[in-house]
């Protein structure tokens, strides 16, 4: 999860988030090189006394600054399209969980189990236990098996919401009347926090998400105790 004064991305917990982190670094390096080149050219233009008053055109330069940006855009677009495909693809998910956004809480339904559904509300600051995080803890965590593909179906009962867990590379809009899909795979156990990422009203900031990723046997025991 995030910590105070953090400048970078959260530690990746899923293959998708690892790919997104690499793509971020790849794109950032390209932007850095372009910015450095532009600043260098501007500095040279401001400091040099040389002029080219007789130059009416420079086709070589025009060709370069047309072809080079096109090549750079391709270098950014290809890995981006690959990641978008990976985020949208899901084959034979082990589990499907339906997530519904409400003002201002989340409800979850494990569609592969009978009567396994619950609401998830934020725990008030006055009820927090030592070591728990303000505005991030919930009364019912979403328990899921690690290292297995999980399909999240996201929608809303009222207004626009957004179901987001940064460390897993997840951010899916919850739209009334529409069912969106996201793929979730956690590479390690633990608690992973998120929040509603779409302004949805007065208590938008009080819609946390907590995923508890556990080994498969522990998940099956939890599911049996809940049904």
Swiss-Prot record:
Q: Which InterPro entries match?
A: CcO_II (IPR045187), CcO_II-like_C (IPR002429), CcO_II_C (IPR034210), Copper_CuA (IPR001505), Cupredoxin (IPR008972), Cyt_c_oxidase_su2 (IPR014222), Cyt_c_oxidase_su2_TM_dom (IPR011759), Cyt_c_oxidase_su2_TM_sf (IPR036257)
Does the record bear Membrane in its keywords? yes
UniProt subcellular location: Mitochondrion inner membrane
Per UniProt, which keywords does this protein have?
Copper, Electron transport, Magnesium, Membrane, Metal-binding, Mitochondrion, Mitochondrion inner membrane, Respiratory chain, Translocase, Transmembrane, Transmembrane helix, Transport
Instruction: Name the cofactor(s) required for activity, per the record.
Output: Cu cation
Q: Does the keyword Chaperone apply?
A: no
Q: What is its EC number?
A: 7.1.1.9
Give the domain of life. Eukaryota
NCBIfam families reported for this sequence: CoxB
Name under which the protein is recorded: Cytochrome c oxidase subunit 2
Q: Which organism is it from?
A: Cratogeomys bursarius (Plains pocket gopher)
Name the gene for this chain: MT-CO2
């Amino acid at each position: 999860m995030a910590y105070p004064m953090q400048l970078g991305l959260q530690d990746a917990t899923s293959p998708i988030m690892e790919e997104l982190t690499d793509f971020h670094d790849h794109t950032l390096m390209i932007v850095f090189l372009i910015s450095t080149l532009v600043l260098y050219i501007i500095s040279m233009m401001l400091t040099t006394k040389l002029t080219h008053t007789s130059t009416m055109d420079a086709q070589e330069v025009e060709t370069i600054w047309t072809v080079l940006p096109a090549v750079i855009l391709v270098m950014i677009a290809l890995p981006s399209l690959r990641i978008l495909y990976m985020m949208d693809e899901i084959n034979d998910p082990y589990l499907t969980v339906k997530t519904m956004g409400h003002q201002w809480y989340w409800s979850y339904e494990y569609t592969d189990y009978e009567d396994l559904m619950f609401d998830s509300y934020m725990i008030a600051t006055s009820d927090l236990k030592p070591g728990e995080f303000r505005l991030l803890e919930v009364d019912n965590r979403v328990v899921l098996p690690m290292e297995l593909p999980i399909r999240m179906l996201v929608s809303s009962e009222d207004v626009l919401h957004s179901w987001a867990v940064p460390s897993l590379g997840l951010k899916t809009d919850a739209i009334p009347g529409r069912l969106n899909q996201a793929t979730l795979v956690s590479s390690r156990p633990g608690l992973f926090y998120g929040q509603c990422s779409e302004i949805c009203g007065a208590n938008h900031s009080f819609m946390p998400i907590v995923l508890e990723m556990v080994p498969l046997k522990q998940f099956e025991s939890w599911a049996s105790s809940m049904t």
